[in-house]
C-alpha cells in the first residue's frame, strides 16, 4: 500500500500540513486545499518585505509556533512604508484556519497592490458615501464611524498612511 504525504519546506508549511491533513478525500482525514499555498505565500511575502524575517520566528521554532499560531508581524512596521496593508494581507494569508485565508484572486485584489490613483478613488468613494448620510438625526453608520474614529485611525489620521500616498493625495486634491 502506498501512502501519500504532503511535502513542503520545514518552517514554511501550513498548520494543516503539520497536523497530517490528507491529500486524498477517501482516507477519512480532512483534506488539504489550495490554502496551504496561500499560507506559504504569506510567509514568503513577509520574508521579502522584511528582508529575511519570518512571521513565526527562527528556523527551529517555526513549526511549533505555526501550530500554536504564535505570529509576530512587528518586523513589518520597521520595514518601511505600506506596512498597514501588507500586515493585514499577510495576517489573512497565514490565518490558522484554512477557510479563513483568502483565495489567490482575493490576494491579487487586496488594497496592498492598489496604485495611488485607486487608493484615492476608494477614499473619495467612501467619503462621498458618508457625505450622503443623514446628519439629523445621524444615521447608524455615521454614528458608528464617529464613535470608532479614533480607535480606527488614531488621533492623527495622516499617520495611518505612508508618505508617498499622502504626497499623491495632495496632488489629486490640488
Predicted features along the sequence, with ranges:
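Regulatory extensions appended to serine/threonine kinase catalytic cores
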Residues: 119-174
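Conserved C-lobe activation region of Hanks-type protein kinase-like domains
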Residues: 19-75
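Conserved C-terminal C-lobe helix
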Residues: 80-94
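Conserved activation segment of eukaryotic-like protein kinases, specifically the C-terminal portion
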Residues: 2-24
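Short, solvent-exposed loop/helix junctions and linker helices
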Residues: 7, 32-35, 80-83
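Terminal C-lobe "cap" of eukaryotic-type protein kinase domains
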Residues: 96-100, 106-120
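Protein kinase-like catalytic domain
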Residues: 49, 67, 94-97, 108
Amino acid at each position: 500500500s502506498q501512502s501519500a504525504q504532503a511535502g513542503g519546506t520545514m518552517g514554511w508549511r501550513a498548520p494543516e500540513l503539520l497536523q497530517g491533513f490528507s491529500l486524498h478525500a477517501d482516507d477519512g482525514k480532512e483534506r488539504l486545499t489550495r490554502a496551504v499555498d496561500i499560507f506559504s505565500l504569506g510567509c514568503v511575502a513577509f520574508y521579502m518585505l522584511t528582508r529575511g524575517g519570518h512571521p513565526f520566528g527562527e528556523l527551529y521554532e517555526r513549526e511549533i509556533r505555526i501550530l500554536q499560531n504564535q505570529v509576530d508581524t512587528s518586523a513589518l512596521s520597521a520595514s518601511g512604508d505600506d506596512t498597514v496593508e501588507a500586515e493585514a494581507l499577510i495576517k489573512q494569508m497565514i490565518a490558522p484556519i484554512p477557510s479563513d485565508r483568502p483565495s489567490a484572486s482575493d490576494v491579487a485584489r487586496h488594497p496592498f497592490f492598489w496604485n495611488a490613483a485607486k487608493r484615492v478613488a476608494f477614499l473619495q468613494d467612501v467619503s462621498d458615501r458618508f457625505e450622503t448620510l443623514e446628519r439629523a438625526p445621524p444615521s447608524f453608520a455615521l454614528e458608528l464611524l464617529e464613535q470608532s474614529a479614533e480607535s480606527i485611525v488614531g488621533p492623527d489620521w495622516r499617520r495611518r498612511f505612508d508618505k508617498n500616498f499622502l504626497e499623491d493625495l495632495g496632488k489629486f486634491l490640488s
